[in-house]
Amino acid sequence: MEVAMAMAVKVLLSLCCVGACGLAVYLYHILWLVPQKVLAKFEDQKIGGPRPSFPYGNLADMREAAAAAKAARASARRSGSGGGGIVHDYRPAVLPYYEKWRKEYGPIFTYSMGNVVFLHVSRPDVVRDINLCVSLDLGKSSYLKATHEPLFGGGILKSNGEAWLHQRKIIAPEFFLDKVKGMVDLMVDSAQPLLMSWEERVDRNGGITDIKIDDDIRAYSADVISRTCFGSSYIKGKEIFMKIRELQQAVSKPNVLAEMTGLRFFPSMRNKQAWELHKQVRKLILEIVKESGEDRNLLSAILHSASTSRVGIAEAENFIVDNCKSIYFAGHESTAVTAAWCLMLLGLHPEWQNRVREEVHEVCRGQPVDSRSLQKMKNLTMVIQETLRLYPAGAFVSRQALQELKLGGVHIPKGVNIYIPVSTMHLDPELWGPDVKEFNPERFSDVRPQLHSYLPFGAGARTCLGQGFAMAELKILISLIVSKFVLKLSPHYQHSPTLKLIVEPELGVDLTLTKVQSVCTKRGTAI
């Protein structure tokens, strides 16, 4: 009996050893040999990059560079530099490793994160070819899909192929120009609580006050997207936006284990928080769906598509919830952050603030803002365009080769993630001139940027569907604010760009406000 037990133990141990060896070989193959083969294909094309290490690729180098940059920022804040030392180039602070590698390896280089290989592209001819590619074989990058699953799911921001094409056909018509024109009055109405609140604060503080503007602008943008696209007031949608904001924070850092192994269900503290927030957001969205009336809006279009699709109830609900979450996030967070950057720049450049204010006065002449007056605000348009050049919400245009492709003369193996650094394209002196890091809206006065040089809304087949909507929303808010207030950058402002899915001011935007006479207000009432 004892002999048999001993033999069984030996067999079991042998099997465990064989299994462990097999797992080790498999992991070595997946985490090292496979990405090395891909990197070798790029090396054959004279495309290099930093040397990866097993098993995390270049993650250690990236973290070290990011930590050093963070320490440098903290030191600068302690020294009291405040807003006086603003440089309109966030790359060394936010993405220091990419800048280092680009200088070492040129405008096209490779790197890896775990077993995921990336091609970092800032060479204009290759960027142009990527943007012009309409093949479904070039899709949205799947990297971070596991990390971002609770926020985006299978919605339009992350889907590929026929699924993405189907969603685009549903959502795109809701953001056509004629639809956006019909939303202008509603956008003006949504701005009134913000304007009245700021006016009351200025009056209460003797005609001048400091305001951290971020939350108020998010409230405005949230109200606009709720009412125009989903028919719900901000009061009803407020909880959704708060939860989505929390969810954004929860998934803003890569989950390396999930991305390398696909094990997104590992019950870490962050995963548990994200799952709980996802459940809460899902519940709130489905409640709004049940309460939705007969109004024709984006929500009704999504509901109609879900009801006519030959899928089960659970899949239909996922379709509704994932796309609502995607639109909530893209439709209010990016716009709110851009508005904050724009007001910061106007506070920093009073000459352009005056030009915009005078233009609004001349165009409106005591009448309410409407779609026609928005089209005539050329200076304001240039200011917003320049804001989007210096502070694009999206740090990258990300794509993935779903099949082997050749773009710009570069052979790209299947599965490779392609990252185009938007800020690098926007700050290329060969594309924009020697004053590339200066705020100069005049550069947009008579020149239409080339497809590969200006990417605030992406480009090509996956260009942001809501860019017309976002521009109208930004024009309305900025025009109403500058027509009522003089803006100055507060002494408390600290320049703090950071990347949390989008590039936002980590410490917010602090402005000093005083009132001015205005003729461009709600329903044409002069003040």
Curated annotation (Swiss-Prot):
The gene is CYP714B3. PROSITE patterns: CYTOCHROME_P450. May be involved in gibberellin metabolism. This is Cytochrome P450 714B3. Belongs to the cytochrome P450 family. The lineage of its organism: Eukaryota, Viridiplantae, Streptophyta, Embryophyta, Tracheophyta. Gene3D superfamilies: Cytochrome P450. The keyword Transmembrane helix applies. Residues 36-527 are cytoplasmic. It is an enzyme of class 1 (oxidoreductase). The keyword Transmembrane helix applies. It comes from Zea mays.
